[in-house]
Amino acid sequence: MKKLLVSDYDQTFYLNDEDIEKNKIAVKEFINKGNMFVIATGRGYDDFMKKKKQYNIEYDYVIINHGATILDKEDNIIFETTMPNEILDSLKSDLHIENAERYFCCSLLESRIEFEHKNLTKVHVKYNDLEYSNEIQKNLEEKYGDILNIYYVSGNSIEIISKNIDKSKSIKLLSEKIGINQEDIYTIGDGYSDIKMIKDYNGYAMKESVQELKESAIGQVNCVSELLEFI
């Protein structure tokens, strides 16, 4: 039976240059056996494509922007989910980007655009202070929690996508398109935006994962190549 493995990228498929080479070899063997491999990352298109080219990463599909965009290996957009345009002005105000160290928005295959562009798939904001970042995130969740997913990602950064999508929902859309059953889907990750896909499928945690993800996982592994030894 064909299997599908979906892996987060940062701190999962990529830990360091040595680790990613082992993972690439294991994935190639997995694909050659008739299985499918998907990267699911919070990165936008340009940021991920730089890594794909740098490390010559092989995959069947890639899910970017925490699930908001799915591409095939020829970079054709298979699915995309945007945030409601009518909330973008108030969201920009509530993010207090004048106090941010940096921010950018993503749409389609564009990774560095402004709020005014509309039809946004993701917003990234980094602040100078973690306490301030946490306060912004809490306020956003109270006001927009029914229409937006707000993720703490790293450092003092938060990223925002539509509530209608996440990595798990994108996997479901993709699995229906390619005809793979839920019981044949395996997932691995380490961060907050990975938790739902770990819960919904045969999910494994990296050893250095957030605690909530570890509690939801079937087991823990050191790397993707280790997981591929027994699935």
Predicted regions and their residues:
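Non-catalytic pre-domain segments flanking phosphatase-related domains
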Residues: 1-7, 22, 176-180
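Asp-based phosphoryl-transfer active-site loop
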Residues: 2-19, 39, 198
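Active-site metal-binding loops of divalent metal-dependent hydrolases
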Residues: 9-11, 43, 190-191
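Active-site phosphate-binding/coordination module
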Residues: 20-112
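Short active-site oxyanion
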Residues: 34-38, 58-60, 182-185, 199-203
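Conserved acidic, metal-coordinating active-site core of Asp-based
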Residues: 98-200, 208, 215
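Short acidic-hydrophobic, aromatic-tinged amphipathic segments that line or gate anion-handling sites
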Residues: 218-226
